[in-house]
């Protein structure tokens, strides 16, 4: 479904769907960086929710709910993420006083992380907006998820990391063909990513960008 706008999760300021990729410009100007979220028209959202909730689970992934995700069908990038199982944990529940405790097994996702969900939606959005390269700043699961989805989409991926980058994560990202660049500090990662966004038109997938 096409959102009507993006809105700051802190101050409520709204902006256009093409950005901002650096979060809310109002909060940023006040020295308090804040993310933004998509906003739908209620007249379209409520019927879409009814359609999704009333039909059988036709797709065994998160795109079963595509009508209420901010990406058009022809832009979807997926590796089958989502629809992970719930497992009953009665003994653990009894110990902590929760009689009907269930655990969501997100390790069943393509890169063994719940972050595959965000990465799939973000890379799909990059495709829909016509961006040619995705970029992030991660040394962990988020970077691996973005790398996998970018590879699936056939899009180059640049990931800024630190010098203390774990070998296991480096290997996982490298398998997907990601360009890995180590920065001296965490802050340097974000500065370099910002340069790629501003100067080269890269699409950022990072906790400091649009959510």
PLM features: residue spans?
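PLP-dependent amino-acid enzyme catalytic core
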Residues: 1-211
């Amino acid at each position: 479904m096409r959102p009507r706008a993006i809105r700051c999760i802190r101050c409520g300021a709204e902006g256009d769907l093409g950005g901002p990729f650096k979060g809310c410009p109002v909060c940023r100007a006040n020295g308090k960086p804040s993310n933004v979220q998509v906003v739908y028209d209620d007249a379209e959202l409520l019927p879409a929710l009814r359609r999704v909730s009333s039909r059988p689970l036709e797709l065994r992934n998160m795109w079963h709910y595509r009508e209420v995700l901010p990406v058009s069908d022809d832009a979807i990038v997926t590796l089958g993420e989502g629809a992970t199982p719930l497992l009953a944990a009665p003994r653990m529940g009894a110990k902590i006083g929760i009689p009907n405790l269930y655990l969501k097994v997100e390790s069943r996702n393509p890169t063994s992380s719940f972050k595959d969900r965000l990465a799939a939606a973000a890379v799909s959005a990059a495709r829909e907006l016509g961006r040619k390269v995705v970029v992030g700043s991660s040394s962990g699961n988020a970077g691996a998820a973005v790398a996998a989805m970018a590879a699936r989409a056939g899009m180059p991926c640049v990931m800024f990391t630190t010098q203390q980058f774990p070998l296991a994560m480096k290997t996982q990202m490298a398998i997907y063909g990601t360009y890995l660049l180590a920065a001296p500090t965490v802050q340097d990662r974000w500065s370099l990513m910002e340069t790629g966004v501003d100067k080269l038109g890269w699409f950022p997938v990072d906790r400091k960008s649009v959510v």
